[in-house]
């Protein structure tokens, strides 16, 4: 985006401004929040993934959660964001340690003593020798050495300056623990600056005293911020917000202390009394900590972390690192989405941007928008039992996707031709329309050629080239109705052999084709395992695999017969998808019974009942096609014999081609 210094980047400049500032334009990445030119959330891809998980047996709520965790082809998921969060946390602990302030104090102390020794070496008086003895007797502990040198009369100006830097450093580090950025802000500060800090702490403690007693007013807070607002870049609007920001930082400072060894704590406690040359600062901070712990007991005041790296952090840096770690742990929990009522809206986008950058926040925001869009646009419904379900709109979209995949497979078959002819499909109305996949109406040759000629009018060609976009078909008023029974095997072997999803996608594709292109046809989906039952496309989509014995094709054929008899005037079609021999049957042939007989290998009675079921389909005049999955020789023998008996067809597709085989067979029948 082009920017001109001092201009609103979203407001076009006047011609005169553009002319006078032509060479001051700068181009850079957009940084004003979410990309305004970014494409909308891809719900089609998201819904397809949710549908795959639901068909595999997950609940819609679980499928949505898994989608948000995985992400999509163009969108980072919550799991990857959480992995980045955990990686950053590990790096903070692995690369750093909390010894920085003590190391810096020891360095300044060594420099001060060395400079003083050099100065004393040039002196010849007895006082210089006595001073050397004092320096030789300094304790190894930096804290005790600093205390003993408090009354020492320095001869070297450089040494005195180094020693004063120690007290100044301690004061700035202590303040930096509670107020981020104070170490740098007070570098080279004057006595007046230090007095202003002390005055701010006194006024802050007085304000919190009044708040604890319930005597403070908004005016008290406003007056405090008017006087000391420069110390609070977070710009709190009231005392409660002020307490929130201060308590988070103070709790991190306490965790810093908890993470130190006992020796380090003792050293820093002793050194803290020398901050800014007196214990007053430490007393004010202790008073502030007491207020904050009482006001915000829910903060983590007792936690600690184990740092193991070589990079030394000072007290302020270490406190910030512990605050970052706490924020990262909170983000990891939010991104895990593993708690009751979890939602991507729970993720703190500002914190995520601070820790991982703006792109991570954009990804998380997009995931939240995706979650809301799926609900708000009607793809997920909550039932009366409180459970989420795929809505009819979602089912149509899934069916459309499944049918599109099938159409691509059918169009990619080499050496096949679709021969269409008018007749039984219906009476011509005289109107035409563009061809769509699944149409059985005859081409309107005149309109098709006209479209091809007009499309190529601007170019010179020796011949007319016809594309799919040119084709128009003649509309018809009526169409012969078909009664279609799709029998799908839902026994556990379908799950174990990875045939579950292809079977469901096949049923969805056929259901969508019938509902959109052959609305007069009556499609009934029948699922059969130990028992058979009629199911809707939505019920089949959400059907979970159950381990139970039995492939009751006999029961399924009985239900198919009922469906065909209900539509006696329609042309009957029976499509069977199965991967195993019939091993169960109903003891009541009419399909009303609940007593199931099971045996393996298939019992002759089961075979006989199933064959009679196929005979019933033949008596009804049904066109029967059986789609055999797998290479079970027993099933192959049985299916081949039954197909010859009822003059049906046997198709042996691979799993990827199952949908194309079933839909293609149905279309072949509709074109007869």
From Swiss-Prot:
Residues 1-40 are annotated as: Disordered. It comes from the Bacteria. Residues 1-10 have a biased composition (Basic and acidic residues). Coiled coil: none annotated. InterPro entries: VWF_A, vWFA_dom_sf. This is Uncharacterized protein MT0986.
């Amino acid at each position: 985006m082009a920017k001109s210094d001092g201009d609103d980047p979203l407001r076009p400049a006047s011609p005169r401004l553009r002319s006078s500032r032509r060479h001051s334009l700068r181009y850079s990445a957009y940084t004003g929040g979410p990309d305004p030119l970014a494409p909308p959330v891809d719900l089609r891809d998201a819904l397809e993934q949710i549908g795959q998980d639901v068909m595999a047996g997950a609940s819609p709520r679980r499928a949505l959660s898994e989608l948000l965790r995985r992400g999509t082809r163009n969108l980072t998921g919550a799991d990857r964001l959480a992995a980045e969060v955990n990686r950053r946390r590990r790096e903070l602990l692995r690369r750093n340690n909390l010894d920085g302030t003590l190391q810096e104090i020891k360095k300044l102390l060594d420099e001060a003593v060395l400079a003083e020794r050099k100065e004393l070496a040039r002196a010849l008086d007895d006082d210089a020798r006595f001073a050397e003895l004092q320096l030789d007797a300094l304790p190894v502990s930096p804290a005790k050495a600093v205390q003993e040198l408090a009354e020492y009369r320095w001869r070297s100006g450089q040494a005195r300056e180094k020693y004063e830097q120690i007290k100044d450093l301690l004061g700035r580090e202590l303040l930096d623990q509670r107020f981020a950025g104070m170490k740098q802000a007070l570098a080279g500060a004057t006595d007046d600056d230090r007095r202003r800090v002390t005055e701010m702490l006194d006024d802050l403690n007085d304000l919190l005293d009044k708040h604890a007693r319930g005597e403070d007013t908004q005016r008290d807070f406003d007056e405090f911020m008017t006087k000391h607002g420069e110390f609070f870049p977070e710009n709190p609007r009231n005392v409660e917000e002020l307490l929130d920001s201060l308590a988070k930082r103070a709790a991190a400072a306490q965790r810093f202390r908890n993470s130190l060894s006992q020796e380090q704590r003792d050293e820093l406690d002793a050194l803290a009394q020398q901050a800014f040359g007196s214990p007053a600062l430490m007393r004010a901070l202790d008073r502030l900590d007491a207020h904050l712990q009482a006001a915000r007991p829910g903060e983590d005041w007792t936690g600690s972390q184990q740092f193991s790296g070589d990079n030394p952090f000072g007290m302020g840096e270490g406190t910030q690192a512990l605050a970052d770690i706490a924020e990262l742990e909170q983000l990891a929990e939010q991104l895990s989405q593993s708690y009751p009522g979890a939602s991507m809206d729970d993720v703190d986008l500002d914190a995520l941007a601070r820790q991982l950058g703006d792109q991570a926040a954009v990804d998380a925001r997009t995931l939240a928008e995706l979650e809301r869009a799926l609900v708000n646009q009607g793809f997920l419904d909550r039932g009366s039992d409180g459970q989420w379900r795929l809505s009819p709109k979602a089912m149509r979209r899934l069916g459309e996707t499944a049918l599109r995949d099938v159409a691509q497979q059918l169009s990619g078959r080499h050496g096949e031709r679709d021969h269409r002819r008018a007749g039984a499909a219906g009476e011509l109305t005289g109107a035409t329309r563009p061809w769509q996949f699944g149409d059985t109406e005859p081409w309107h040759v005149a309109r098709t050629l006209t479209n091809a000629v007009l499309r190529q009018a601007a170019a010179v060609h020796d011949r007319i080239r016809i594309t799919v976009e040119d084709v128009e078909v003649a509309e018809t008023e009526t169409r012969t109705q078909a009664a279609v029974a799709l029998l799908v095997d839902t026994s556990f072997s379908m799950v174990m052999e990875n045939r579950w999803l292809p079977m469901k996608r096949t049923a969805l594709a056929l259901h969508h084709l019938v509902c959109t292109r052959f609305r007069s046809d009556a499609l009934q989906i029948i699922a059969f395992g130990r028992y058979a039952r009629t199911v809707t496309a939505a019920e089949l989509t959400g059907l979970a695999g159950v381990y139970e014995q039995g492939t009751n094709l006999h029961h399924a054929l009985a239900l198919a017969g009922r469906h065909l008899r209900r539509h006696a005037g329609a042309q009957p079609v029976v499509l069977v998808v199965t991967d195993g021999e019939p091993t169960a049957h109903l003891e009541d042939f009419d399909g009303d019974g609940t007593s199931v007989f099971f045996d393996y290998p298939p019992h002759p009675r089961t075979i006989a009942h199933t064959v009679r079921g196929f005979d019933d389909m033949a008596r009804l005049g049904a066109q029967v096609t059986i789609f055999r999955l797998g290479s079970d020789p027993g099933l192959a023998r049985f299916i081949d014999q039954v197909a010859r008996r009822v003059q049906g067809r046997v198709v042996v597709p691979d799993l990827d081609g199952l949908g194309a085989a079933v839909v293609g067979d149905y279309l072949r029948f509709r074109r007869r």
